[in-house]
From Swiss-Prot:
Disordered as annotated region, ranges: 268-290
Encoding gene per record: BIP1
Function: Probably plays a role in facilitating the assembly of multimeric protein complexes inside the ER.
Domain of life: Eukaryota
Main location: endoplasmic reticulum
Alphabetized Gene3D superfamilies for the sequence: 1.20.1270.10, 3.30.420.40, Substrate Binding Domain Of DNAk, Chain A, domain 1 (2.60.34.10)
Listed GO CC annotations: endoplasmic reticulum lumen
Chain span(s) of sequence motif Prevents secretion from ER: 287-290
Chain positions carrying an annotated carbohydrate: 241
GO terms for MF: ATP binding; ATP-dependent protein folding chaperone
Cited SUPFAM superfamilies: Actin-like ATPase domain, Heat shock protein 70kD (HSP70), C-terminal subdomain, Heat shock protein 70kD (HSP70), peptide-binding domain
Protein name from the UniProt record: Luminal-binding protein 1
UniProt biased composition (Acidic residues): 280-290
PANTHER family xrefs: HEAT SHOCK PROTEIN 70KDA
Length: 290
Protein backbone atom coordinates (compact mmCIF):
# COMPACT_ATOMS: atom_id res chain seq x y z
CA UNK A 1 0.00 0.00 0.00
CA UNK A 2 2.79 2.42 0.96
CA UNK A 3 4.75 1.59 -2.22
CA UNK A 4 1.67 2.29 -4.36
CA UNK A 5 1.10 5.64 -2.61
CA UNK A 6 4.72 6.61 -3.28
CA UNK A 7 4.40 5.59 -6.92
CA UNK A 8 1.24 7.68 -7.33
CA UNK A 9 2.80 10.66 -5.57
CA UNK A 10 5.90 10.64 -7.84
CA UNK A 11 3.95 10.48 -11.11
CA UNK A 12 4.18 6.72 -11.60
CA UNK A 13 7.91 6.32 -10.92
CA UNK A 14 8.80 2.95 -9.41
CA UNK A 15 10.37 3.20 -5.94
CA UNK A 16 13.88 1.77 -5.63
CA UNK A 17 13.51 -1.60 -3.91
CA UNK A 18 17.20 -2.49 -3.96
CA UNK A 19 19.50 -2.80 -0.97
CA UNK A 20 21.82 0.08 -0.16
CA UNK A 21 25.34 -1.38 -0.67
CA UNK A 22 26.76 0.42 2.37
CA UNK A 23 23.96 -0.93 4.53
CA UNK A 24 24.51 -4.44 3.12
CA UNK A 25 28.20 -4.27 4.07
CA UNK A 26 27.31 -3.01 7.55
CA UNK A 27 24.73 -5.76 8.07
CA UNK A 28 27.16 -8.41 6.83
CA UNK A 29 29.92 -7.16 9.11
CA UNK A 30 27.54 -7.18 12.08
CA UNK A 31 26.40 -10.73 11.33
CA UNK A 32 29.99 -11.93 10.85
CA UNK A 33 30.98 -10.29 14.11
CA UNK A 34 28.14 -12.00 15.90
CA UNK A 35 29.08 -15.39 14.45
CA UNK A 36 32.77 -15.03 15.30
CA UNK A 37 32.06 -13.83 18.85
CA UNK A 38 29.49 -16.53 19.49
CA UNK A 39 26.94 -13.91 20.51
CA UNK A 40 24.76 -14.07 17.43
CA UNK A 41 22.08 -16.16 19.08
CA UNK A 42 19.29 -17.89 17.20
CA UNK A 43 19.25 -15.16 14.54
CA UNK A 44 22.66 -16.18 13.16
CA UNK A 45 22.95 -19.88 13.96
CA UNK A 46 21.79 -20.98 10.49
CA UNK A 47 23.61 -18.27 8.52
CA UNK A 48 26.70 -19.20 6.52
CA UNK A 49 28.85 -16.31 5.25
CA UNK A 50 31.30 -17.24 2.50
CA UNK A 51 34.43 -15.31 1.56
CA UNK A 52 35.24 -15.22 -2.15
CA UNK A 53 38.16 -14.19 -4.36
CA UNK A 54 37.30 -10.58 -5.36
CA UNK A 55 39.20 -10.82 -8.68
CA UNK A 56 40.43 -13.59 -10.97
CA UNK A 57 43.94 -14.85 -10.19
CA UNK A 58 46.30 -16.18 -12.85
CA UNK A 59 49.72 -16.07 -14.50
CA UNK A 60 51.17 -14.68 -17.71
CA UNK A 61 51.71 -17.10 -20.59
CA UNK A 62 53.13 -16.60 -24.10
CA UNK A 63 51.89 -13.48 -25.84
CA UNK A 64 51.12 -11.67 -22.59
CA UNK A 65 47.95 -13.72 -22.07
CA UNK A 66 46.31 -13.78 -18.64
CA UNK A 67 45.83 -17.50 -18.03
CA UNK A 68 43.27 -17.82 -15.24
CA UNK A 69 43.61 -20.37 -12.44
CA UNK A 70 41.16 -19.10 -9.80
CA UNK A 71 38.12 -17.29 -11.24
CA UNK A 72 36.55 -14.27 -9.59
CA UNK A 73 33.98 -15.08 -6.87
CA UNK A 74 35.49 -18.52 -6.18
CA UNK A 75 34.75 -19.43 -2.56
CA UNK A 76 37.89 -19.46 -0.40
CA UNK A 77 39.81 -21.33 0.89
CA UNK A 78 40.55 -22.91 -2.48
CA UNK A 79 43.35 -24.63 -4.39
CA UNK A 80 43.92 -25.07 -8.13
CA UNK A 81 46.79 -26.59 -10.14
CA UNK A 82 47.57 -26.49 -13.86
CA UNK A 83 50.46 -27.85 -15.92
CA UNK A 84 52.40 -25.53 -18.25
CA UNK A 85 55.42 -26.05 -20.48
CA UNK A 86 58.37 -24.21 -22.04
CA UNK A 87 58.25 -21.84 -24.99
CA UNK A 88 61.81 -22.31 -26.31
CA UNK A 89 64.09 -25.25 -27.04
CA UNK A 90 66.58 -26.00 -24.24
CA UNK A 91 64.83 -23.52 -21.92
CA UNK A 92 66.08 -24.01 -18.33
CA UNK A 93 64.23 -21.18 -16.56
CA UNK A 94 60.61 -20.04 -16.51
CA UNK A 95 59.31 -16.81 -15.03
CA UNK A 96 56.09 -17.06 -13.04
CA UNK A 97 54.27 -13.72 -12.97
CA UNK A 98 51.15 -13.64 -10.80
CA UNK A 99 48.31 -11.27 -11.73
CA UNK A 100 44.79 -10.39 -10.61
CA UNK A 101 42.15 -8.97 -12.93
CA UNK A 102 39.43 -9.76 -15.44
CA UNK A 103 41.04 -8.75 -18.75
CA UNK A 104 42.46 -11.15 -21.35
CA UNK A 105 45.97 -9.66 -21.33
CA UNK A 106 48.22 -9.16 -18.32
CA UNK A 107 49.04 -5.60 -19.39
CA UNK A 108 45.47 -4.73 -18.38
CA UNK A 109 45.64 -6.64 -15.08
CA UNK A 110 47.54 -6.02 -11.84
CA UNK A 111 50.87 -7.67 -11.06
CA UNK A 112 50.93 -9.19 -7.56
CA UNK A 113 54.37 -10.80 -7.60
CA UNK A 114 56.82 -12.87 -9.62
CA UNK A 115 59.57 -15.44 -9.27
CA UNK A 116 61.78 -17.68 -11.43
CA UNK A 117 61.96 -21.46 -11.48
CA UNK A 118 65.45 -22.50 -12.57
CA UNK A 119 67.24 -25.78 -13.16
CA UNK A 120 64.76 -27.21 -15.66
CA UNK A 121 66.37 -30.03 -17.65
CA UNK A 122 67.15 -28.82 -21.22
CA UNK A 123 64.65 -30.28 -23.68
CA UNK A 124 62.77 -29.41 -26.86
CA UNK A 125 60.11 -26.75 -26.52
CA UNK A 126 56.87 -28.10 -25.07
CA UNK A 127 58.49 -31.13 -23.41
CA UNK A 128 59.01 -30.10 -19.74
CA UNK A 129 55.96 -30.13 -17.48
CA UNK A 130 55.76 -27.27 -14.98
CA UNK A 131 52.94 -27.62 -12.46
CA UNK A 132 51.76 -24.29 -11.05
CA UNK A 133 49.58 -24.39 -7.93
CA UNK A 134 47.53 -21.49 -6.55
CA UNK A 135 46.25 -21.83 -2.99
CA UNK A 136 44.21 -19.16 -1.21
CA UNK A 137 43.63 -19.70 2.51
CA UNK A 138 40.70 -18.53 4.64
CA UNK A 139 42.49 -15.24 5.33
CA UNK A 140 42.89 -14.44 1.63
CA UNK A 141 46.63 -15.15 1.62
CA UNK A 142 47.78 -16.50 -1.76
CA UNK A 143 50.54 -19.09 -2.05
CA UNK A 144 51.86 -19.83 -5.54
CA UNK A 145 54.18 -22.76 -6.20
CA UNK A 146 55.83 -23.88 -9.45
CA UNK A 147 57.36 -27.36 -9.71
CA UNK A 148 59.26 -29.01 -12.55
CA UNK A 149 57.73 -32.49 -12.62
CA UNK A 150 60.86 -33.83 -14.31
CA UNK A 151 63.45 -32.76 -11.73
CA UNK A 152 61.23 -32.13 -8.71
CA UNK A 153 62.71 -28.65 -8.30
CA UNK A 154 60.28 -26.00 -7.09
CA UNK A 155 59.96 -22.36 -6.07
CA UNK A 156 57.12 -20.47 -4.42
CA UNK A 157 55.88 -17.05 -3.38
CA UNK A 158 53.42 -15.88 -0.72
CA UNK A 159 51.24 -12.85 -1.42
CA UNK A 160 49.40 -11.42 1.58
CA UNK A 161 46.17 -9.45 1.27
CA UNK A 162 47.48 -6.39 3.11
CA UNK A 163 50.21 -5.28 0.67
CA UNK A 164 48.56 -2.54 -1.36
CA UNK A 165 45.60 -4.68 -2.40
CA UNK A 166 42.77 -2.98 -4.24
CA UNK A 167 39.85 -1.16 -2.66
CA UNK A 168 36.27 -2.21 -3.41
CA UNK A 169 35.93 0.78 -5.76
CA UNK A 170 39.04 -0.26 -7.70
CA UNK A 171 37.80 -3.85 -7.94
CA UNK A 172 34.44 -2.69 -9.29
CA UNK A 173 36.22 -0.44 -11.81
CA UNK A 174 38.30 -3.37 -13.11
CA UNK A 175 35.19 -5.53 -13.46
CA UNK A 176 33.39 -2.74 -15.38
CA UNK A 177 36.36 -2.27 -17.70
CA UNK A 178 36.48 -6.01 -18.40
CA UNK A 179 32.82 -5.92 -19.42
CA UNK A 180 33.33 -2.78 -21.51
CA UNK A 181 36.30 -4.18 -23.44
CA UNK A 182 35.14 -7.81 -23.55
CA UNK A 183 34.65 -7.96 -27.33
CA UNK A 184 37.93 -6.19 -28.09
CA UNK A 185 39.82 -8.41 -25.64
CA UNK A 186 38.28 -11.52 -27.20
CA UNK A 187 39.59 -10.58 -30.65
CA UNK A 188 43.09 -9.87 -29.35
CA UNK A 189 43.15 -13.17 -27.44
CA UNK A 190 41.97 -15.11 -30.52
CA UNK A 191 44.74 -13.55 -32.63
CA UNK A 192 47.39 -14.52 -30.06
CA UNK A 193 45.97 -18.05 -29.79
CA UNK A 194 46.03 -18.44 -33.59
CA UNK A 195 49.68 -17.36 -33.72
CA UNK A 196 50.60 -19.70 -30.86
CA UNK A 197 48.83 -22.62 -32.57
CA UNK A 198 50.82 -22.10 -35.76
CA UNK A 199 54.10 -21.70 -33.89
CA UNK A 200 53.47 -24.75 -31.71
CA UNK A 201 52.60 -26.93 -34.72
CA UNK A 202 55.73 -25.88 -36.61
CA UNK A 203 58.09 -26.51 -33.69
CA UNK A 204 56.35 -29.79 -32.95
CA UNK A 205 56.99 -30.94 -36.52
CA UNK A 206 60.63 -29.82 -36.39
CA UNK A 207 61.19 -31.79 -33.19
CA UNK A 208 59.46 -34.90 -34.52
CA UNK A 209 61.47 -35.18 -37.73
CA UNK A 210 64.72 -34.91 -35.76
CA UNK A 211 63.76 -37.31 -32.96
CA UNK A 212 64.76 -40.94 -33.60
CA UNK A 213 62.03 -42.12 -31.24
CA UNK A 214 59.43 -40.40 -33.41
CA UNK A 215 59.93 -39.77 -37.13
CA UNK A 216 63.64 -39.29 -37.81
CA UNK A 217 64.25 -42.91 -38.80
CA UNK A 218 60.91 -43.41 -40.55
CA UNK A 219 60.98 -40.59 -43.11
CA UNK A 220 62.29 -40.85 -46.65
CA UNK A 221 64.85 -38.15 -47.46
CA UNK A 222 62.47 -36.31 -49.81
CA UNK A 223 59.69 -36.41 -47.19
CA UNK A 224 61.96 -34.94 -44.55
CA UNK A 225 63.11 -32.25 -46.98
CA UNK A 226 59.52 -31.22 -47.73
CA UNK A 227 58.69 -30.86 -44.03
CA UNK A 228 61.94 -28.99 -43.32
CA UNK A 229 61.21 -26.56 -46.15
CA UNK A 230 57.61 -26.02 -45.03
CA UNK A 231 58.53 -25.40 -41.39
CA UNK A 232 61.46 -23.13 -42.29
CA UNK A 233 59.25 -21.01 -44.54
CA UNK A 234 56.54 -20.86 -41.86
CA UNK A 235 59.00 -19.60 -39.23
CA UNK A 236 60.31 -16.97 -41.64
CA UNK A 237 56.73 -15.92 -42.35
CA UNK A 238 56.08 -15.62 -38.59
CA UNK A 239 59.13 -13.38 -38.20
CA UNK A 240 57.92 -11.14 -41.03
CA UNK A 241 54.30 -11.03 -39.84
CA UNK A 242 54.41 -10.31 -36.13
CA UNK A 243 51.11 -8.40 -36.25
CA UNK A 244 49.15 -10.52 -38.70
CA UNK A 245 45.43 -11.09 -38.20
CA UNK A 246 43.88 -14.24 -36.74
CA UNK A 247 42.68 -15.37 -40.17
CA UNK A 248 46.20 -15.00 -41.60
CA UNK A 249 47.69 -17.28 -38.94
CA UNK A 250 44.91 -19.82 -39.42
CA UNK A 251 45.43 -19.84 -43.19
CA UNK A 252 49.18 -20.30 -42.81
CA UNK A 253 48.61 -23.20 -40.40
CA UNK A 254 46.36 -24.90 -42.96
CA UNK A 255 49.06 -24.47 -45.62
CA UNK A 256 51.73 -26.13 -43.45
CA UNK A 257 49.36 -28.90 -42.36
CA UNK A 258 48.47 -29.60 -46.00
CA UNK A 259 52.14 -30.38 -46.65
CA UNK A 260 53.07 -32.16 -43.41
CA UNK A 261 50.01 -34.16 -42.39
CA UNK A 262 49.80 -36.37 -45.53
CA UNK A 263 53.48 -37.26 -45.10
CA UNK A 264 52.98 -38.14 -41.43
CA UNK A 265 49.94 -40.25 -42.29
CA UNK A 266 51.89 -42.12 -45.00
CA UNK A 267 54.79 -42.79 -42.63
CA UNK A 268 52.56 -44.31 -39.98
CA UNK A 269 50.64 -46.34 -42.53
CA UNK A 270 53.94 -47.82 -43.72
CA UNK A 271 55.01 -48.61 -40.17
CA UNK A 272 51.60 -49.86 -39.07
CA UNK A 273 51.26 -47.26 -36.33
CA UNK A 274 48.84 -44.43 -35.69
CA UNK A 275 49.59 -40.88 -36.79
CA UNK A 276 50.70 -38.69 -33.93
CA UNK A 277 52.49 -35.61 -32.76
CA UNK A 278 51.86 -33.16 -35.53
CA UNK A 279 48.09 -33.32 -35.65
CA UNK A 280 46.11 -30.29 -34.59
CA UNK A 281 43.95 -32.53 -32.36
CA UNK A 282 46.90 -33.34 -30.15
CA UNK A 283 47.99 -29.73 -30.31
CA UNK A 284 44.73 -28.65 -28.69
CA UNK A 285 45.46 -30.92 -25.73
CA UNK A 286 48.86 -29.30 -25.15
CA UNK A 287 49.89 -27.11 -22.25
CA UNK A 288 50.08 -23.32 -22.27
CA UNK A 289 53.66 -22.09 -22.63
CA UNK A 290 55.63 -19.94 -20.19
Amino acid sequence: KVQQLLKDYFDGKEPNKGVNPDEAVAYGAAVQGGILSGEGGDETKDILLLDVAPLTLGIETVGGVMTKLIPRNTVIPTKKSQVFTTYQDQQTTVSIQVFEGERSLTKDCRLLGKFDLTGIAPAPRGTPQIEVTFEVDANGILNVKAEDKGTGKSEKITITNDKGRLSQEEIERMVREAEEFAEEDKKVKERIDARNSLETYVYNMKNQINDKDKLADKLESDEKEKIETATKEALEWLDDNQSAEKEDYEEKLKEVEAICNPIITAVYQRSGGAPGGGSSEEEEDGHDEL
